[in-house]
């Protein structure tokens, strides 16, 4: 099938082309982010492949449907950027990659937590400038600290076990569906308020839905233990960034490490080093000394890219042969 591949990055082409040797699809790579204006690039393509920052809203879907698109193939797990009702109304099936490498994201979460706590990102910059002073780089032992987790799916579960068994942390978790297997490792499931009140570090591992958008808002931040450090490798929209900035300024939040940002569509996966970034909220956040921001790269391993390519192209082939698959979100 012909696939219009949006938000294409140079590092994606090799794994997709390698896997596609077995599937023989025709892939047209477009660097453009998908939206209602760029949707015309998918004309006569029955399949459109999108990533996290593509805007697959009702207006975009209407254009795609008019031009013959029958399948939206997400090459990611999250689908909050897709209007599922509009897809169904336009007769478009939606599939995703439910899991590619939970280890990649879990390991990166631990890396961010360690870097934030021990200020490794600041130490690296200092040494490059021949500044070997340790002032301002004091961290804390993780052993014995309380880690709070909101969400214990595949990724959250791996993070929980790593911190409990590997570092000797006390791990308190909250999930609408508690993972009983994790309790065997000494991980405690408690109410959300208890997690917030006791956590020295809070890791977010929940999906972005209408119910979880701005989950971390002014009220929630005020209810947390003073000086808490927050790590988010899930979705940027979980955090009200303006409220977070205020909480950092007041000292209520002691720092944060974020691989995602609610306004990342305008920033991430682009080289803006020679441009003026007009998002003042992001600029303010990123310039705090106790904040570490990376550009949505937690998933970014060779193994994950290969798995994403395999699942995405298999989803397309399954659609072509009308095979049912658990990757389907909206079926038409």
From Swiss-Prot:
Cited PANTHER family: 2-HYDROXYACID DEHYDROGENASE HOMOLOG 1-RELATED
Sequence similarity: Belongs to the D-isomer specific 2-hydroxyacid dehydrogenase family.
Location of the active site: 235, 264, 296
The organism's place on the tree of life at top rank: Eukaryota
A Pfam family per the record: 2-Hacid_dh
InterPro entries reported for this sequence: D-isomer_2_OHA_DH_cat_dom (IPR006139), D-isomer_DH_CS (IPR029753), D-isomer_DH_NAD-bd (IPR006140), NAD(P)-bd_dom_sf (IPR036291)
EC numbers, comma separated: 1.1.1.-
Any GO molecular function: oxidoreductase activity, acting on the CH-OH group of donors, NAD or NADP as acceptor
Location of this chain's protein in the cell: Cytoplasm; Nucleus
Keyword field: Cytoplasm, NAD, Nucleus, Oxidoreductase
A GO CC term attached to the entry: nucleus
Binding site for NAD(+): 154-155, 233-235, 259, 296-299
Protein name, UniProt field: 2-hydroxyacid dehydrogenase homolog 1
The organism of origin for this protein: Schizosaccharomyces pombe (strain 972 / ATCC 24843) (Fission yeast)
């Amino acid at each position: 099938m012909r696939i219009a591949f949006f938000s294409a990055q140079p590092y994606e082409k090799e794994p997709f082309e390698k896997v596609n040797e077995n599937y023989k699809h025709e892939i047209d790579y477009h660097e453009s982010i998908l939206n209602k204006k760029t949707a015309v690039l998918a004309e006569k393509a029955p399949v459109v492949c999108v990533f996290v920052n593509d805007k697959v809203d009702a207006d975009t879907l209407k254009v795609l449907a008019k031009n013959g698109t029958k399948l939206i193939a997400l090459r990611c797990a999250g689908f909050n950027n897709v209007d599922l009702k509009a897809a169904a109304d336009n007769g478009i099936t939606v599939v995703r990659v439910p899991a590619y490498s939970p280890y990649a994201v879990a390991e990166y979460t631990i890396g961010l937590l360690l870097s934030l706590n021990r200020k490794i990102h600041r130490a690296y910059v200092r040494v490059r400038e021949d500044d070997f002073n340790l002032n301002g780089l004091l961290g804390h032992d993780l052993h014995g600290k309380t880690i709070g987790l909101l969400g214990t799916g595949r990724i959250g579960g791996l993070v929980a076990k790593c911190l409990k068994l590997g570092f000797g942390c006390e791990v308190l978790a909250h999930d609408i569906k508690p993972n009983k297997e994790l309790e065997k490792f000494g991980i405690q499931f408690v109410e959300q308020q208890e997690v917030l009140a006791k956590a020295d570090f809070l890791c977010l591992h929940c999906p972005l839905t209408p119910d979880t958008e701005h989950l971390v808002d002014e009220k929630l931040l005020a209810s947390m233990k003073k000086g808490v450090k927050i790590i988010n490798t899930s979705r940027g929209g979980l955090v009200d960034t303006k409220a977070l900035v205020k909480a950092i300024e007041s000292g209520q939040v002691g720092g944060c490490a974020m691989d995602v940002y609610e306004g990342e569509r305008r920033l991430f996966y682009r080289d803006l080093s020679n441009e003026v970034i007009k998002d003042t909220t992001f600029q303010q956040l990123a310039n705090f000394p106790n904040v570490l921001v990376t550009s949505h790269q937690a998933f970014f391993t060779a193994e994950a890219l290969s798995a994403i390519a395999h699942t995405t192209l298999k989803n397309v082939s399954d659609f072509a042969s009308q095979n049912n698959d658990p990757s389907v979100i909206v079926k038409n």
